[in-house]
Amino acid sequence: MKHFTFADNYLRTYIDTVTFGFKFIVHPVNYTDLSISIMIGEQNLFNLVKLIPNVRKLHLYFTDENTKYNLESITKLTKLRVLVVFSQFEKKSRPRLYNIKSLNKLKLDSIVIYDKILDPFNPVYQWPQIRDRKFKLVKSIDIKGPIINYNVNRIRFHNHLFEKYPVCCSNFIVQLINQPDNTQIYQVIYRYQEQYIEDQIYIQTIDKSKFLRFIYGENVLNTEIYYPQCQQDLYIDDIDNNSN
C-alpha cells in the first residue's frame, strides 16, 4: 500500500525524513492501493479524487477535528471497491463527515467508517451524541412520576444559595416536583459534612432562580428560560445524524 499525505490540494510524499522535505505530486497517479492522510485545514477532496483515478482500495486518515469533510466527491472514484476511514486521534475524536449515504452509488465491496462496518448499499453512520455544554453540570436526569431528579456534579455553593454556610459535597440531587394544580416545587437534597460532626442528608426547598442556577451553573436573570426536563434534553440536536 502506497502512502501519501494530501495538503494544499496536492498529494505529497517525503523525500527527506530528516528535514521533512516534500515532493508535491500534481498529476494523477496509477496506484490502486492507497493510504492517504488528509492534513489539517480545509482540503478539497474533489482535487484529491482527480489525482487517484485508478484506486481500488483506499484508506483515508482525517486529522482535523475542527473541519467537516464532504465525502460526495469520493463517488467519482468509479473503480473503488474498498473504503476505510480512520481518525488520526483514534477514539478520542472523530472528524465529522458529510454525505456518507451518497457512497451507495459506488456499490462498494466494503466500507468502514471509524471502526464501524457499514452496509455498502445503505451506508449510515450514527454519530455519538453530543452533550449540550450549557448543562455540563448535570450528570443525568431521572423521572419518577411527577418528580424530575437532576443529578448535579460536585460544586461548591456559597451563602447566596444556602443561608448559613457554604456547602461542599460530592453531588446534589435537585428536584422539580410537579403539583396537581400545575405549579412546581423545587428542592435540593445534599449530604453536608461539618468538622467533627457526622455527615447528614439535608433537604432544602429553593426558589426557581436557585433551581436554574444549579442547572446552568450561573445566575439566570430570566426565570422563564428553557431548561432540560429529560435525559435527551442534555444533548444537542445533531443535524449530522439526519444528513450523513
Swiss-Prot record:
Further information in the entry reads: Has been named in honor of Robin Offord, pioneer of proteomics, at the occasion of his retirement from the University of Geneva.
Q: What is this protein called?
A: Robin
